[in-house]
Swiss-Prot record:
Sample GO molecular function, one term: orotidine-5'-phosphate decarboxylase activity
Catalytic activity: orotidine 5'-phosphate + H(+) = UMP + CO2
Keywords noted in UniProt: Decarboxylase, Lyase, Pyrimidine biosynthesis
InterPro entries named in the record: Aldolase_TIM, OMPdecase_AS, OMPdecase_type-2, OMPdeCOase_dom, RibuloseP-bd_barrel
Catalytic center residues: 93
UniProt protein name: Orotidine 5'-phosphate decarboxylase
Name of the top EC class for this enzyme: lyase
Highest taxon listed in the record's lineage: Bacteria
Pathway note: Pyrimidine metabolism; UMP biosynthesis via de novo pathway; UMP from orotate: step 2/2
SUPFAM superfamilies in the record: Ribulose-phoshate binding barrel (SSF51366)
């Protein structure tokens, strides 16, 4: 189960850092081929350089789907390269109904064998049900995302005067989490909102993107959510260098993100 593997990796590596494996062909180091094979080489080098620093890896489905069947194979090879004791969280943001949702769930959990997935709640419970029924898998549901456009919908006020994203958090915590396999996606760019969500629903793990390139502050996130925060960093680590020493550079950046966490636990 994702959370068990996450807790074990977080303890052994003294880290709640999740590295997003979002390989952009245009940004691969110059010596690597700009194709699916290059992506696999790139990802494997990043994984080898950072596997003792992370609590999870999060491949983003879109970067692999864009390459067709070769990209799908690259995704499977990437997942196979991740040490078995480190959980894999698929960033897919799925959200559909009926047999379509069932097919998405089967693709993620059976074909790819990932431990967790991100989901969109916009279509309601039945669009999430095929995922939530898999009690051995964890579902991170979009709640307060780090992109500025999230305000267009997530910050709409309901009749009780509270924003929609808090209703999403309530639904997840009180109605959709019967298998205790739910978490929320909350952006690091909104630490006050993270604190509110964590105070109301402290049992929910929080996947927190937006640290690094998007401007989120890791110390503010840890102050708001503590041990429940899974800090995702992608571009800042992946593209720390465009040269042949890119993996070593990625490791140094990843290590820098560990300092606040270690300071928090070991004053």
């Amino acid at each position: 189960m994702f959370m068990q593997k996450f807790r074990a990796a977080a303890t052994s590596n003294r880290s709640t850092l999740c590295i997003g494996l979002d390989p952009d062909l245009a940004r691969l180091p110059e010596h690597l081929p700009r194709d699916a094979a290059g992506i696999v080489q790139f990802n494997q080098a990043i994984i080898e350089a950072t596997s003792d620093l992370v609590c999870a890896y999060k491949p983003n489905m879109a970067f692999y789907e864009a390459l067709g069947s070769a990209g799908w194979l690259a995704l499977k090879q990437t997942i196979a390269s991740i040490p078995s004791h480190i959980p894999v969280l698929l960033d897919a943001k799925r959200g559909d109904i009926g047999s379509t949702a069932q097919a998405y769930a089967s693709a993620a959990f059976d074909e790819l064998g990932v431990d967790a997935i991100t989901l969109s709640p916009y279509m309601g419970y039945d669009s999430l049900q095929p995922f939530l029924e898999r009690a051995d898998k964890t579902c991170f549901i979009l709640c307060r995302t780090s992109n500025p456009g999230g305000d267009d919908v997530q910050n709409l006020l309901l009749d009780n005067g509270e924003p929609l994203f808090l209703k999403i958090a309530e639904l997840v915590a009180k109605r959709w989490n019967s298998n205790h396999n739910c978490g929320l996606v909350v952006g690091a760019t909104y630490p006050a909102e993270i604190a509110t969500i964590h105070q109301r629903y402290p049992e929910l793990p929080l996947l927190v993107p937006g640290v690094g390139s998007q401007g989120g502050d890791i110390e503010e996130v840890l102050a708001a959510a503590g041990e429940q925060a899974i800090i995702n960093v992608s571009r800042s680590v992946l593209y720390a260098s465009g040269g042949s020493s890119f993996a070593e550079a990625a490791r140094k950046v990843a290590q820098a993100f560990l300092v606040p966490k270690q300071a928090l636990n070991h004053p």
